[in-house]
Protein backbone atom coordinates (compact mmCIF):
# COMPACT_ATOMS: atom_id res chain seq x y z
CA UNK A 1 0.00 0.00 0.00
CA UNK A 2 1.12 3.54 -0.73
CA UNK A 3 2.28 5.77 2.12
CA UNK A 4 1.25 8.91 0.23
CA UNK A 5 -1.97 8.12 -1.66
CA UNK A 6 -5.25 6.43 -0.87
CA UNK A 7 -7.17 5.41 2.21
CA UNK A 8 -4.37 3.24 3.59
CA UNK A 9 -2.02 6.21 3.65
CA UNK A 10 -4.78 8.36 5.14
CA UNK A 11 -5.52 6.04 8.03
CA UNK A 12 -1.84 5.54 8.87
CA UNK A 13 -1.32 9.31 8.90
CA UNK A 14 -4.39 9.80 11.11
CA UNK A 15 -3.15 7.18 13.55
CA UNK A 16 0.25 8.89 13.74
CA UNK A 17 -1.44 12.24 14.41
CA UNK A 18 -3.48 10.73 17.26
CA UNK A 19 -0.29 9.18 18.64
CA UNK A 20 1.55 12.53 18.48
CA UNK A 21 -1.28 14.18 20.39
CA UNK A 22 -1.20 11.40 22.97
CA UNK A 23 2.56 11.76 23.39
CA UNK A 24 2.15 15.49 24.02
CA UNK A 25 -0.30 14.79 26.87
CA UNK A 26 1.79 12.06 28.49
CA UNK A 27 -0.04 9.15 26.87
CA UNK A 28 -3.51 10.36 27.85
CA UNK A 29 -5.14 9.00 24.68
CA UNK A 30 -5.77 5.35 23.90
CA UNK A 31 -5.21 5.08 20.13
CA UNK A 32 -6.86 2.06 18.54
CA UNK A 33 -7.51 0.37 15.21
CA UNK A 34 -10.52 -1.77 14.39
CA UNK A 35 -10.09 -4.17 11.47
CA UNK A 36 -13.09 -5.96 9.96
CA UNK A 37 -13.06 -8.05 6.79
CA UNK A 38 -15.96 -7.49 4.40
CA UNK A 39 -16.51 -10.34 1.97
CA UNK A 40 -16.85 -9.31 -1.64
CA UNK A 41 -20.31 -9.31 -3.18
CA UNK A 42 -21.00 -8.63 -6.87
CA UNK A 43 -24.27 -6.91 -5.91
CA UNK A 44 -22.64 -4.47 -3.48
CA UNK A 45 -20.15 -1.62 -3.83
CA UNK A 46 -17.45 -3.87 -2.36
CA UNK A 47 -16.75 -6.42 -5.08
CA UNK A 48 -13.81 -8.23 -3.49
CA UNK A 49 -12.77 -9.11 0.06
CA UNK A 50 -11.73 -5.84 1.71
CA UNK A 51 -10.52 -4.82 5.15
CA UNK A 52 -12.49 -1.92 6.63
CA UNK A 53 -10.26 -0.16 9.16
CA UNK A 54 -11.43 2.40 11.71
CA UNK A 55 -9.01 4.59 13.67
CA UNK A 56 -10.04 6.18 16.95
CA UNK A 57 -8.67 7.75 20.11
CA UNK A 58 -10.20 7.67 23.60
CA UNK A 59 -9.67 10.23 26.35
CA UNK A 60 -10.73 7.97 29.22
CA UNK A 61 -13.24 9.40 31.71
CA UNK A 62 -12.18 9.81 35.33
CA UNK A 63 -15.54 8.74 36.81
CA UNK A 64 -17.50 6.98 34.06
CA UNK A 65 -14.82 5.20 31.98
CA UNK A 66 -17.39 3.06 30.15
CA UNK A 67 -19.65 6.01 29.33
CA UNK A 68 -18.82 7.75 26.04
CA UNK A 69 -19.51 10.85 24.04
CA UNK A 70 -18.35 10.35 20.48
CA UNK A 71 -17.46 12.56 17.52
CA UNK A 72 -16.89 10.87 14.19
CA UNK A 73 -15.61 11.84 10.77
CA UNK A 74 -15.06 9.68 7.67
CA UNK A 75 -11.73 8.85 6.07
CA UNK A 76 -13.02 7.50 2.76
CA UNK A 77 -14.21 9.44 -0.28
CA UNK A 78 -15.51 8.84 -3.80
CA UNK A 79 -15.87 10.42 -7.22
CA UNK A 80 -18.57 10.13 -9.91
CA UNK A 81 -18.39 6.34 -10.17
CA UNK A 82 -18.75 4.85 -6.67
CA UNK A 83 -16.86 1.76 -7.86
CA UNK A 84 -13.81 3.72 -9.07
CA UNK A 85 -11.05 2.94 -6.60
CA UNK A 86 -8.22 4.30 -8.74
CA UNK A 87 -9.11 7.87 -9.74
CA UNK A 88 -8.06 10.84 -7.64
CA UNK A 89 -10.70 11.37 -4.97
CA UNK A 90 -9.41 14.02 -2.55
CA UNK A 91 -12.66 14.37 -0.57
CA UNK A 92 -11.54 17.70 0.84
CA UNK A 93 -14.98 18.59 2.18
CA UNK A 94 -16.57 15.12 2.12
CA UNK A 95 -15.16 14.26 4.49
CA UNK A 96 -11.68 15.48 5.33
CA UNK A 97 -13.36 18.38 7.13
CA UNK A 98 -15.11 16.11 9.62
CA UNK A 99 -11.93 14.12 10.18
CA UNK A 100 -9.88 17.29 10.66
CA UNK A 101 -12.41 18.41 13.26
CA UNK A 102 -12.04 15.13 15.16
CA UNK A 103 -8.24 15.43 15.14
CA UNK A 104 -8.36 19.02 16.34
CA UNK A 105 -10.70 18.17 19.19
CA UNK A 106 -8.43 15.30 20.19
CA UNK A 107 -5.64 17.88 20.49
CA UNK A 108 -7.71 20.45 22.39
CA UNK A 109 -9.75 18.20 24.68
CA UNK A 110 -6.76 16.01 25.58
CA UNK A 111 -5.56 18.90 27.75
CA UNK A 112 -8.51 18.46 30.13
CA UNK A 113 -9.97 15.69 32.27
CA UNK A 114 -13.66 14.79 32.07
CA UNK A 115 -15.81 12.40 34.13
CA UNK A 116 -17.03 10.76 30.90
CA UNK A 117 -14.85 9.24 28.18
CA UNK A 118 -14.52 11.16 24.91
CA UNK A 119 -13.95 9.17 21.72
CA UNK A 120 -12.79 10.81 18.45
CA UNK A 121 -13.00 8.54 15.42
CA UNK A 122 -12.18 8.26 11.75
CA UNK A 123 -14.47 5.67 10.17
CA UNK A 124 -14.02 3.88 6.84
CA UNK A 125 -16.36 2.50 4.22
CA UNK A 126 -19.06 5.17 4.55
CA UNK A 127 -19.50 5.67 0.81
CA UNK A 128 -19.65 1.91 0.25
CA UNK A 129 -22.45 1.24 2.73
CA UNK A 130 -21.80 2.78 6.17
CA UNK A 131 -19.55 -0.14 7.09
CA UNK A 132 -17.22 1.63 9.51
CA UNK A 133 -20.10 2.94 11.60
CA UNK A 134 -21.80 -0.45 11.55
CA UNK A 135 -18.72 -2.21 12.88
CA UNK A 136 -17.96 0.31 15.62
CA UNK A 137 -21.62 0.35 16.70
CA UNK A 138 -21.63 -3.46 16.87
CA UNK A 139 -18.45 -3.41 18.97
CA UNK A 140 -19.98 -0.85 21.34
CA UNK A 141 -23.14 -2.94 21.71
CA UNK A 142 -21.30 -6.21 22.32
CA UNK A 143 -18.93 -4.64 24.86
CA UNK A 144 -21.71 -2.82 26.69
CA UNK A 145 -20.60 0.75 26.09
CA UNK A 146 -22.85 3.41 27.59
CA UNK A 147 -23.09 6.06 24.88
CA UNK A 148 -24.52 9.46 25.74
CA UNK A 149 -24.37 10.62 22.14
CA UNK A 150 -22.71 10.32 18.74
CA UNK A 151 -21.99 13.48 16.77
CA UNK A 152 -21.47 12.52 13.14
CA UNK A 153 -19.73 15.35 11.30
CA UNK A 154 -20.05 14.80 7.58
CA UNK A 155 -19.22 17.82 5.41
CA UNK A 156 -18.61 20.84 7.64
CA UNK A 157 -16.54 23.04 5.33
CA UNK A 158 -18.66 24.38 2.46
CA UNK A 159 -20.38 27.78 2.65
CA UNK A 160 -21.32 28.30 -1.02
CA UNK A 161 -24.41 26.43 -2.15
CA UNK A 162 -24.93 25.23 -5.70
CA UNK A 163 -27.77 27.79 -5.79
CA UNK A 164 -25.29 30.62 -5.19
CA UNK A 165 -26.18 31.24 -1.53
CA UNK A 166 -23.14 32.03 0.62
CA UNK A 167 -23.62 31.54 4.37
CA UNK A 168 -20.84 31.04 6.92
CA UNK A 169 -23.01 30.88 10.05
CA UNK A 170 -25.79 28.38 9.40
CA UNK A 171 -25.52 24.61 9.82
CA UNK A 172 -27.93 21.69 10.05
CA UNK A 173 -28.48 19.14 12.82
CA UNK A 174 -30.33 16.01 11.65
CA UNK A 175 -31.99 13.68 14.15
CA UNK A 176 -34.54 10.87 14.12
CA UNK A 177 -37.62 11.24 16.37
CA UNK A 178 -37.38 7.96 18.27
CA UNK A 179 -35.45 4.70 18.23
CA UNK A 180 -36.59 2.04 15.77
CA UNK A 181 -36.04 -0.47 18.60
CA UNK A 182 -38.72 1.00 20.84
CA UNK A 183 -41.54 -1.36 21.76
CA UNK A 184 -45.23 -0.79 21.17
CA UNK A 185 -45.58 -0.04 24.89
CA UNK A 186 -42.82 2.59 24.76
CA UNK A 187 -44.33 4.23 21.70
CA UNK A 188 -47.71 4.34 23.42
CA UNK A 189 -46.11 6.00 26.46
CA UNK A 190 -44.55 8.61 24.18
CA UNK A 191 -47.90 9.30 22.61
CA UNK A 192 -49.55 10.07 25.95
CA UNK A 193 -46.65 11.41 28.03
CA UNK A 194 -44.26 12.96 25.56
CA UNK A 195 -43.72 13.48 21.89
CA UNK A 196 -41.36 12.89 19.02
CA UNK A 197 -38.99 15.56 20.34
CA UNK A 198 -38.42 13.48 23.49
CA UNK A 199 -36.54 10.72 21.68
CA UNK A 200 -32.88 10.37 22.70
CA UNK A 201 -31.43 11.45 19.36
CA UNK A 202 -33.82 14.39 19.17
CA UNK A 203 -32.84 15.40 22.72
CA UNK A 204 -29.18 15.18 21.72
CA UNK A 205 -29.84 17.46 18.75
CA UNK A 206 -31.56 19.95 21.01
CA UNK A 207 -28.57 19.87 23.37
CA UNK A 208 -26.22 20.72 20.49
CA UNK A 209 -28.56 23.57 19.54
CA UNK A 210 -28.58 24.87 23.13
CA UNK A 211 -24.83 24.60 23.70
CA UNK A 212 -24.23 26.37 20.38
CA UNK A 213 -26.50 29.24 21.37
CA UNK A 214 -24.71 29.49 24.72
CA UNK A 215 -21.09 29.37 23.58
CA UNK A 216 -21.26 30.42 19.91
CA UNK A 217 -24.26 32.77 19.75
CA UNK A 218 -23.26 34.08 16.33
CA UNK A 219 -23.95 30.66 14.79
CA UNK A 220 -27.34 29.67 13.38
CA UNK A 221 -28.12 25.99 14.04
CA UNK A 222 -31.09 24.50 12.19
CA UNK A 223 -32.85 21.53 13.79
CA UNK A 224 -33.89 19.24 10.93
CA UNK A 225 -36.41 16.70 12.17
CA UNK A 226 -35.31 13.81 9.94
CA UNK A 227 -32.70 11.08 10.16
CA UNK A 228 -30.79 12.60 7.24
CA UNK A 229 -31.30 14.33 3.91
CA UNK A 230 -33.91 12.75 1.65
CA UNK A 231 -32.65 9.39 0.43
CA UNK A 232 -29.17 9.90 1.89
CA UNK A 233 -27.26 8.30 4.74
CA UNK A 234 -24.49 8.92 7.23
CA UNK A 235 -22.46 7.14 9.87
CA UNK A 236 -24.77 8.08 12.74
CA UNK A 237 -27.42 5.76 11.30
CA UNK A 238 -25.76 2.42 12.20
CA UNK A 239 -25.53 3.63 15.81
CA UNK A 240 -29.21 4.60 15.77
CA UNK A 241 -30.10 1.17 14.43
CA UNK A 242 -28.66 -0.59 17.51
CA UNK A 243 -30.27 1.85 19.93
CA UNK A 244 -27.66 4.58 20.50
CA UNK A 245 -28.54 8.29 20.25
CA UNK A 246 -26.79 9.85 17.28
CA UNK A 247 -27.13 12.90 15.05
CA UNK A 248 -25.58 14.40 11.93
CA UNK A 249 -23.97 17.85 11.95
CA UNK A 250 -23.27 19.39 8.55
CA UNK A 251 -23.20 22.51 6.44
CA UNK A 252 -26.48 24.17 5.49
CA UNK A 253 -25.80 24.72 1.78
CA UNK A 254 -24.43 21.85 -0.29
CA UNK A 255 -22.62 22.27 -3.59
CA UNK A 256 -23.14 19.28 -5.86
CA UNK A 257 -20.48 20.51 -8.28
CA UNK A 258 -18.00 19.61 -5.53
CA UNK A 259 -19.64 16.46 -4.17
CA UNK A 260 -19.07 12.96 -5.58
CA UNK A 261 -17.58 14.40 -8.79
CA UNK A 262 -14.63 13.56 -11.02
CA UNK A 263 -12.11 16.40 -10.97
CA UNK A 264 -12.63 18.28 -14.24
CA UNK A 265 -13.76 21.51 -15.88
CA UNK A 266 -16.83 21.50 -18.12
CA UNK A 267 -18.44 24.54 -19.74
CA UNK A 268 -16.39 26.80 -17.53
CA UNK A 269 -17.52 25.05 -14.32
CA UNK A 270 -14.97 23.43 -12.01
CA UNK A 271 -16.03 20.08 -10.59
CA UNK A 272 -14.48 18.03 -7.81
CA UNK A 273 -14.13 17.97 -4.04
CA UNK A 274 -10.84 19.87 -3.79
CA UNK A 275 -9.43 22.02 -1.02
CA UNK A 276 -10.27 25.32 -2.72
CA UNK A 277 -13.93 24.56 -1.95
CA UNK A 278 -13.34 24.40 1.82
CA UNK A 279 -13.84 27.46 3.99
CA UNK A 280 -11.47 26.92 6.91
CA UNK A 281 -13.05 29.52 9.19
CA UNK A 282 -16.44 27.85 8.85
CA UNK A 283 -14.90 24.43 9.47
CA UNK A 284 -13.28 25.82 12.63
CA UNK A 285 -16.62 27.23 13.79
CA UNK A 286 -18.38 23.89 13.41
CA UNK A 287 -15.49 22.17 15.16
CA UNK A 288 -16.05 24.61 18.04
CA UNK A 289 -19.75 23.68 17.98
CA UNK A 290 -18.69 20.08 18.57
CA UNK A 291 -16.25 21.08 21.30
CA UNK A 292 -19.01 22.84 23.23
CA UNK A 293 -21.40 19.91 22.87
CA UNK A 294 -18.84 17.21 23.70
CA UNK A 295 -17.39 19.02 26.71
CA UNK A 296 -20.77 19.81 28.25
CA UNK A 297 -21.95 16.23 27.73
CA UNK A 298 -18.71 14.80 29.12
CA UNK A 299 -18.98 17.02 32.22
CA UNK A 300 -22.61 16.07 32.85
CA UNK A 301 -23.73 13.30 35.20
CA UNK A 302 -25.26 10.10 33.89
CA UNK A 303 -28.88 10.32 32.81
CA UNK A 304 -31.41 9.75 35.62
CA UNK A 305 -33.06 6.37 36.09
CA UNK A 306 -36.64 5.41 36.87
CA UNK A 307 -38.07 8.76 35.82
CA UNK A 308 -41.76 9.15 36.64
CA UNK A 309 -44.24 11.83 35.68
CA UNK A 310 -47.28 12.84 37.70
CA UNK A 311 -49.47 15.81 38.39
CA UNK A 312 -52.80 14.75 36.89
CA UNK A 313 -55.55 17.12 38.15
CA UNK A 314 -52.85 19.37 39.58
CA UNK A 315 -51.73 22.75 38.21
CA UNK A 316 -48.09 21.64 37.80
CA UNK A 317 -46.35 18.54 36.48
CA UNK A 318 -44.53 16.48 39.11
CA UNK A 319 -41.33 14.68 38.11
CA UNK A 320 -39.40 12.16 40.18
CA UNK A 321 -36.27 10.11 39.53
CA UNK A 322 -33.55 8.15 41.28
CA UNK A 323 -30.57 10.12 42.51
CA UNK A 324 -27.62 10.15 40.10
CA UNK A 325 -24.09 9.53 41.39
Residue ranges, per PLM feature:
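Active-site-adjacent mobile loop/cap segments within catalytic or ligand-binding domains
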Residues: 156-174, 223-299
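Metal-dependent peptidase/peptidase-like ectodomains
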Residues: 123-237, 242, 246
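A non-catalytic alpha/beta surface segment that caps or lines the substrate-entry region
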Residues: 1-60
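Alpha-helical metal-binding/catalytic segments enriched in His/Glu/Asp
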Residues: 57, 71, 76-77, 81-130, ...
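Proline-enriched interdomain boundary motifs that mark the N-terminal boundary
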Residues: 300-310
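Structural recognition of the beta-strand scaffold that forms the well-ordered cores
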Residues: 31-33, 54-58, 68-73, 91, ...
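Second-shell loop/turn segments in exported
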Residues: 1-8, 40-46, 83-95, 108, ...
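Conserved aromatic anchor
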Residues: 315-325
Amino acid sequence: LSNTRGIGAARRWIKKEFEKISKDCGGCLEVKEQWTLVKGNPKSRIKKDTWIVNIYAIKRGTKYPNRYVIMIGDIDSRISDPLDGEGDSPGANDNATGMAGALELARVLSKYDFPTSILLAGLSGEEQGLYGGKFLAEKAKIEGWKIAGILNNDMIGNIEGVDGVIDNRTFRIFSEPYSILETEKQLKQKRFYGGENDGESRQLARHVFASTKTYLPEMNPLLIYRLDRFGRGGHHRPFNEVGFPGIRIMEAHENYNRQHQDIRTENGIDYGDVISGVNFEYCAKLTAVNAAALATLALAPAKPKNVKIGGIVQPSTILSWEKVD
